[in-house]
Amino acid sequence: MLPVLRSDFSNVKIEPIFEEMVDFDTFAKSDFRAVKILACEAVPKSKKLLKFTLDDGERKDRVILSGIHEYYEPEELVGKTAIAIVNLPPRKMMGIDSEGMLISAVHEEDGHEGLNLLMVNDRIPAGAKLY
C-alpha cells in the first residue's frame, strides 16, 4: 500500500460552494473528456493566454485557449493528459477560436492566487469521458 501524502493547507482559502443547485439534466449536458496535450504555445500579444492543441480522441486537433501562462510554461505541459469540457460553443479570443475549456483548481494561499491544471494519469486515453 502506498503511503498517503498530506500537505498543510492551513494557509489556503477556497471559494465558497455555490448555494444555487443545478439539476441533474443540466449537469448531464456537460461533456468532460480526457485530452492529450499535443502542443502548447504562448499567444502573441497576450500575457495570460496559452494556446493548446489537443487530441480529444474523436477528430482532428482541438484548439483551446486558457489564461494560465502565469502558472505554467508551455513546454512543461506537452505530452500531459488534462481534463476539458468539450461541448461549449466556440469563443474567439485574440482572434483564435477556443473550442472548450480546460479544467483547473483555483485557491488563494498567503494572499496569492494559486492555480493547478487538472491532469490525470497518462494511461487514460484521449477522449475518455468523465462521469
Map each language-model feature to its residues.
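Phosphate-backbone binding interfaces of nucleic-acid-interacting proteins
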Residues: 2-131
